[in-house]
Each structure stands twice: as structure tokens, then as C-alpha cells.
Amino acid sequence: AFGAANPLPARAQGGLPTLGDGSDLTSSEERRLGDRIIRELYRDPDYIDDPVIGEYVQGIWQPLMAAARARGELSPELDERFAWEVLLGRDRTVNAFALPGGYLGLHLGLIGVVGTRDELASVMAHELSHVTQRHISRLLTQQSRQTPLLLGAMVLGALAASKNPGATQALVVGGQALAMQNQLNFSRDMEREADRVGMGLMEPAGFAPEGFVGMFDKLQQANRINDNGSWPYLRSHPLTTQRIADMQSRLPSGGLTASSPSVLQAEHAMVTARARVLSRPGVDVLRQWVAEPQGTGFAALPPARQAGVLYAAALGSSQLRDAAGARRWAGQLQQLVKNDAAATRLAKLLRAELELAADDAPAALAAMPPGDSRRPEMLLRTQIVLRTGQSKEVTGPLQTWLATHPRDASAWQAMAAVWNAQGQPLRAVRAEAEVHAARYDYAAAVDRFKAGQDLARRSTSADDHFEASIIDTRLRAVQSLRREQAAER
């Protein structure tokens, strides 16, 4: 499961920052701790970088970040020092979690159940507020009198398996029974503060505050009927009547308004459908989703919900190796959303993805929406032209993207494949090294940069001289980062 980890070895625990003086964890220490945790999550088989879902999530995350800056909730120091990255996990459980250093984790299971964009924004605003309010540092300071090893327990807690009903998750999981009760009590205060601060971000960021109440209603219903471990968010974020009442009282009318924009949009329905399918629900569930458009109740659904059903049926058919069925449902989807620009774009991307999965690269290229400057188009087009032998078409867009997004590991992977296809092994090796560096695996990055140096020494091409100098410079920089990383152990 995404976020699972085995206990840290004694050497790793001993190398964590100590809290003997009871002082707050500094922002630099918290960032380093977060980087260590995130390095393990990048290696987790459930980690997924899906460009379509990732772009949709970023479209929520960035306005929330801007609102936090504008309202003074996000200090310039934290803004500069923390990572502010969102990671996705394939896990089907409904969960989200904040990590040290400005990292946020979202399970596809949660994205798959949120009813509106505003509901997803409410979860992300809440988690963002856990970070901006320095809850991790505050809690560790409170607990440091009991045991400095609590920081090690916090690392384990942040990575605890979400499918384990006995694990108290999210920000902190105490490793010792003595500390547990105080942690839970403090957590309630944190939850209320994150609710209040997070809700204050919603309207300035362009989201309806009613999304908080809608999400709370959904969680409350799940709390009543579901106790099978699939909603760990309820354990890590205890839902109390006080929290619900507090959020309702903060709405202008004390409840949902008739003019609330919290309605289902086709784009959102399609993204949540994608999240459900990519969470690997199993063959039987996929078959149910594929059959749903033929059910008697499909015609009575609102158009936006129909779009989600058709998207799941098309992508599910593709995963079941039914290319004809995938094309049929994708065609119906495109017809349904033809007057909705955002949904039409997603439908075209899906059609291209399905054609590529069916091994018809020319059809995939023809199905692509115009332009390749946006990340989903750029990465999918790269996969397609690598099949058609036209990889030079994407070299420029990839290089332009990486110039402004140097930590995009997936883009570096695509760049490596493109350079290999064009017979430029030195550039490919450098790109492979950058993949590891972007995921904080500096040891592996150093190995690839050194391999690049060896390759450059054997090269007789004058064009490789410039690339070799880049490799030398990057190797020195990454070796320095590796030494810092080793010193923390």
C-alpha cells in the first residue's frame, strides 16, 4: 500500500534530529525529514505519476497555495524552504495525509469518491493548513519530554500502511502507548485549526466553502455504515459533531446555500472515474463498470455523471484488453461532451491513450488534442512518437518543459527515451541520472552521472563535449547533496 514502510533500522532512527531541548523543529530540519520520507514513497510500487489526474490536482493545489500566501497563512520562509509537492498513490482506500516539509499525499481512493471539485479542494486545504500551521513541529515539541524517539515514530506513522486498521495515521503515529493519548487529544485541536484555516482559503482560491460541509457529510455517512478499513481518513482525522457544527456555522447562511457552485462537472466526473480505474479494483469490478452504460438507469443520469460512467467503461475496457469496447464507449463519451471544452480535451486524451494501448500509434496520434505544451499532451505524445519513429517532434517541447520543471522525473524519463531513440546515448544517460536526482535518490544519480563520464571519455563526437561538461557540473552538485544526505543518517 502507498505509504507503507517497514520499521526503520536503529542506525536510521539514531540519525534523526533530536529534540532534547524541547525546541521547535526548524523548517530546514522538517524539510530534510520530509525529503527522507518522500524518497521512500517514490520507491513505493503504489506511487503513481498520472499526468491527467496530477494536472487536475495541481489546478486545485496552486490556487490554494496562492490563497495561503495572500492571507498570510504561508510565510515567505516556509514558502521558500518547503517542497509543496503532491504525490498520488494507487491505494483504493480513502485517505490523504500531510508530511513534513510541505509534502501532501492523496490516495486515488479518495479522489475517486469526492463528489465535486470543491470537496477535493476542502481536503487539500485542510492538509495544506496542517503544514502551514506547523502542526508537525508543534506536536513533536509537545511530546519531546516523553521521548526523543517519537520523531522516529512519527516517520513510521507518516508511512504507516493505510490498510492497517490499528494504525493511527496522518501527521503522527506515536510508537509508544504512553504518548498515544496526548497525541490524540492534541490532534483534535489540530483538526479544528486545520478546518478553520483551510476553510478560510476556499473562497479566495475560487472554491465554494460548502465543499467542506459536503465532504464532512460524506465522511459522516461513511462513518455510520463503513468499518472495513477502507476509509482510514476517518481514523487519522476524527470526525466529531463539534467539527461539523463549527464548519456549518462558518457558512454565510449556516448551511448549504441554494446558489452553491458545488455541483458535479463532467471534467471532475471523468477525473474521478479515471482515479477509480487506475486504483486497480480487480477484473470483476472493471466488468461491472464496463456494463454500466448498458444498464437501465444510465439514461436517467445527469450528463456529467454519464460522462464519468462512459469514461470508466472505456478505460476499463482497455484494461480488460477489449479495444473495440473501449473505442465504442470513448466515441459515445466524445459525442456527449462535445460542447464542453475541458471535458472534450480529456475525452481526446483518453481516446489517444486507448489507441496507443491497442498498439495503433497512428490512430493515437490522430486522436490527440492540438498542442503539446501542457504536460499530459506532451508526455502522451512522446509515448506515441516513440512508437512511430518521429521522436524529434517532441525534443523541443520536452527540453522547454524541463528548463522550468527540472524536478519532473517523468519528463526526464521521457527525455531519456527520446535521446536513446535518436542515437544520443550520452544525453540519455544524463537524463536517466536526473530521474534519480529528482526523486532524491542521489546515490543512484551519482552512479549514472559517472557512467556518463565514462561514456564521454570514450566518445569521439564533438557534440558530446558540451554535454560532458554539464554532466561534470551536475555530478559535483549531486555529490554534495549525497554527502549531506549521508550525514543525516
Language-model features: where?
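Acidic/histidine metal-binding catalytic segments
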Residues: 140-152, 167-170, 206-216
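Hydrophobic or amphipathic, alpha-helical segments that drive membrane association/targeting
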Residues: 1-97, 180, 222-224, 327, ...
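Short pre-active-site segment immediately N-terminal to the catalytic Zn-binding motif
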Residues: 105-122, 184-189
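Short alpha-helical catalytic segment bearing the HExxH-like zincin motif
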Residues: 105, 119-127, 131, 173, ...
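Catalytic Zn2+-binding segment of zinc metalloproteases
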Residues: 115-119, 128-145, 163
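Extracytoplasmic and endomembrane cell-envelope/extracellular-matrix remodeling and assembly machinery
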Residues: 20-21, 47, 55, 70-73, ...
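Membrane-active amphipathic alpha-helices enriched in small hydrophobic residues
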Residues: 148-163, 170-178
